[in-house]
């Protein structure tokens, strides 16, 4: 028997779409986040286009 939160965590990868400051921070945080159930592992960190802010969005394989 699974509760709603457990089911949601399997269907929805929480790491997908997470935003980090800086490429290195994203790579570390995203790799960890994409190890969660439903994520399928780390795919990439995508730079969010903005000249002043160095922000990166996390993508997991099955996100």
Curated annotation (Swiss-Prot):
<dbReference type="Pfam" id="PF17560">
    <property type="entry name" value="Megourin"/>
</dbReference>
<dbReference type="GO" id="GO:0045087">
    <property type="term" value="P:innate immune response"/>
</dbReference>
<protein>
    <recommendedName>
        <fullName>Megourin-3</fullName>
    </recommendedName>
</protein>
<keyword id="KW-0044">Antibiotic</keyword>
<dbReference type="InterPro" id="IPR035171">
    <property type="entry name" value="Megourin"/>
</dbReference>
<dbReference type="GO" id="GO:0005576">
    <property type="term" value="C:extracellular region"/>
</dbReference>
<keyword id="KW-0964">Secreted</keyword>
<keyword id="KW-1015">Disulfide bond</keyword>
<dbReference type="GO" id="GO:0050832">
    <property type="term" value="P:defense response to fungus"/>
</dbReference>
<dbReference type="GO" id="GO:0042742">
    <property type="term" value="P:defense response to bacterium"/>
</dbReference>
<keyword id="KW-0929">Antimicrobial</keyword>
<keyword id="KW-0295">Fungicide</keyword>
<comment type="subunit">
    <text>Monomer.</text>
</comment>
<keyword id="KW-0391">Immunity</keyword>
<dbReference type="GO" id="GO:0031640">
    <property type="term" value="P:killing of cells of another organism"/>
</dbReference>
<keyword id="KW-0399">Innate immunity</keyword>
<comment type="function">
    <text>Has antimicrobial activity against Gram-positive bacteria and fungi.</text>
</comment>
């Amino acid at each position: 028997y699974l509760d709603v939160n457990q089911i949601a965590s399997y269907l929805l990868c929480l790491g997908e779409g997470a935003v980090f400051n800086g490429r290195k921070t994203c790579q570390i945080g995203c790799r960890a986040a994409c190890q969660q159930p439903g994520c399928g592992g780390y795919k990439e960190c995508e730079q969010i286009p903005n000249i002043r802010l160095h922000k990166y969005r996390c993508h997991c394989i099955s996100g």
